[in-house]
Curated annotation (Swiss-Prot):
Keywords: Ribonucleoprotein, Ribosomal protein. It comes from Halobacterium salinarum (strain ATCC 700922 / JCM 11081 / NRC-1). One of its GO terms (molecular function) is structural constituent of ribosome. The lineage of its organism: Archaea, Methanobacteriati, Methanobacteriota, Stenosarchaea group, Halobacteria. This is Large ribosomal subunit protein eL21. One of its GO terms (cellular component) is ribonucleoprotein complex.
Length: 99
């Protein structure tokens, strides 16, 4: 039986930028501020290593429940179980609210 090649072996597509997005990401993303109770989307920014979450949670939507240092605590539901992730602002996007 072959080796697994590590815990991030099947996450290559999630950890690569599209050709148009390569290089330094916009600084506005890294300093964005989110309020408690705000809904946010989890999207990995491969250009920023700090504050990254495990790729298994990529694409989920969660709720900001607080801060820890410069990062945000985001609560997500993973298969019926609530989990709290510590995520940097560069990896979060605000969910658009319908008006």
């Amino acid at each position: 039986m072959p080796n697994s090649n590590g815990p991030l072996s099947n996450s290559g597509g999630k950890l690569q930028n599209d050709p148009r997005d390569r290089g330094t990401s916009p600084p506005q993303r890294a300093i964005a501020d989110y309020d408690d109770g705000e809904s946010v989307h989890l999207t990995l920014d491969p250009s920023v290593q700090d504050g990254r979450f495990h790729p298994r949670f990529s694409g989920l939507t969660g709720t900001v429940v607080g801060t820890q240092g410069d990062a945000f605590k985001v609560e997500v539901n993973d298969g019926g179980m609530d989990k709290t992730l510590i995520v940097g602002a560069a990896h979060l996007r605000t969910q658009r609210q319908e008006e």
